[in-house]
């Protein structure tokens, strides 16, 4: 049975402006759960929890495996380091002060520190070994995207269109690059990435930018999408996906825009294809895997931009970004299912219902296992048999 959802309702609950907000008469139809003959069944190694999770709020708050620990956080401010062997808590820290912490951007683990952003406009830094709070700085706008730490800096991309760099040790602001933000944008921002002293990020105005980390000097900008249409909704062109770097090329995709391959040094386009998405992509080095605005899962040849396969059976199931685990593409959805697709064909290989409350972010790899966190904060470490 297909589930019919109001676009306006989706916007109200914030799952996504990914569908755009329209009149009450506009509806989308969520595809039913596909019938899959499972080729394998993952086993659960242990379970744990992290507060109340992120609830029904928009969130890309993602766990991280680093320093032989699993780091997780909840929207209301609880941060934990877990033992990957048994899920037991090594340390925990409550970041709530006068108001709910509203953690939203992260987690980032670098320099022996945990960097987390919040909807309250804060960048918070903890000691990764002890959980001790080291420093906390205010920024103009929400921090919805994962911070980036490189070259001794930690950088955040805010909802006001600013990329701000702080000294990773002291929290002192070093530089800021600002961009114009349209009146209406999607919920979410592009997490910056870096290589060879350069930082790259997408903007709400439909452009991709590059800057020199050491100076905060803008190097180039490249349009990914051009506003079209009569209404502000039609003219949404946010580039919310985090750029993806493969060799000498950089890949990005925009909402109502294009999937584009760029020369990393010059920013000049190598090829463009008509795909619309606000989700991060993944790659196995030869292929790009993306989820479109309609939740179609697509594989594209990274060299030429040729579409290799497309799976449309999960349409409007509010998928997470695609994750590569072994020879599979793994996606979770808003009804709490994990879907496993064959990397070469896009065909279903397995499916599990993890939690009916839904899953907001992709699973992560933990050595030869993987970790799933539900919207309500339940944590499962699992392994393919």
From Swiss-Prot:
SUPFAM superfamilies: Quinoprotein alcohol dehydrogenase-like
HAMAP family: OM_assembly_BamB
Membrane topology classification: Lipid-anchor
Record GO biological process: Gram-negative-bacterium-type cell outer membrane assembly; protein insertion into membrane
Subcellular location field: Cell outer membrane
Keyword Membrane: yes
Protein task: Part of the outer membrane protein assembly complex, which is involved in assembly and insertion of beta-barrel proteins into the outer membrane.
Covalent lipid sites (N-palmitoyl cysteine): 21
UniProt KW keywords: Cell outer membrane, Lipoprotein, Membrane, Palmitate, Signal
Predominant place of localization: membrane
Gene this chain is encoded by: bamB
Record bears the keyword Signal: yes
Family: Belongs to the BamB family.
Signal peptide boundaries: 1-20
Source organism per UniProt: Aliivibrio fischeri (strain ATCC 700601 / ES114)
Gene Ontology CC annotation, any one: cell outer membrane
Subunit architecture: Part of the Bam complex.
PROSITE patterns in UniProt: PROKAR_LIPOPROTEIN
Residues covalently joined to lipid (S-diacylglycerol cysteine): 21
Name by which UniProt lists this protein: Outer membrane protein assembly factor BamB
Pfam family, one: PQQ_2
């Amino acid at each position: 049975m297909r589930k019919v959802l109001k676009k306006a309702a989706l916007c109200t609950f914030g799952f996504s402006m990914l569908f755009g907000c329209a009149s009450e008469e506009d509806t989308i139809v969520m595809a039913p759960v596909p019938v899959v003959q499972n080729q394998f069944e993952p086993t659960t190694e242990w379970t744990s929890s992290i507060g109340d999770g992120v609830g029904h709020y928009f969130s890309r708050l993602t766990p991280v495996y680093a320093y032989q620990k699993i780091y997780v956080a909840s929207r209301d401010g609880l941060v934990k380091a877990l033992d990957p062997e048994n899920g037991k808590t090594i340390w925990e820290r409550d970041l709530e002060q006068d108001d709910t912490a509203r953690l939203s951007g992260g987690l980032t683990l670098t320099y022996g520190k945990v960097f987390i952003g919040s909807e309250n406009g804060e960048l918070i830094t903890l000691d990764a070994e002890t959980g001790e709070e080291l420093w906390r700085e205010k920024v103009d706008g929400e921090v919805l995207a994962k911070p980036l730490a490189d070259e001794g800096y930690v950088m955040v991309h805010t909802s006001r269109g600013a990329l701000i760099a702080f000294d990773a040790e002291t929290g002192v602001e070093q530089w800021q690059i600002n961009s114009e933000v349209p009146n209406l944008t999607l919920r979410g921002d592009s997490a910056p990435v870096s290589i060879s002293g350069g930082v790259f990020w997408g903007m709400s105005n439909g452009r991709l930018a590059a800057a020199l980390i050491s100076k905060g000097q803008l190097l180039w900008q490249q349009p990914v999408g051009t506003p079209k249409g009569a209404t502000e909704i039609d003219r949404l062109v946010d580039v919310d996906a985090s750029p993806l770097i493969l060799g000498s090329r950089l890949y990005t995709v925009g909402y109502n825009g294009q999937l584009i391959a760029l020369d990393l040094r010059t920013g000049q386009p190598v090829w463009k294809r008509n795909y619309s998405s606000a989700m991060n992509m993944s790659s196995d080095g030869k292929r790009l895997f993306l989820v479109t605005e309609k939740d179609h899962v697509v594989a594209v040849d990274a060299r030429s931009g040729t579409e290799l396969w497309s799976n449309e059976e999960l349409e409007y199931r509010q998928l997470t970004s695609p994750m590569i685990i072994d020879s599979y593409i793994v996606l979770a959805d808003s009804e709490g299912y994990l879907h496993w697709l064959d990397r070469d064909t896009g065909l279903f290989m397995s499916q599990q219902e993890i939690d009916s409350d839904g899953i907001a972010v992709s699973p992560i790899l933990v050595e030869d296992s993987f970790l799933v966190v539900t919207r309500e904060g339940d944590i499962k470490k699992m392994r393919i048999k």
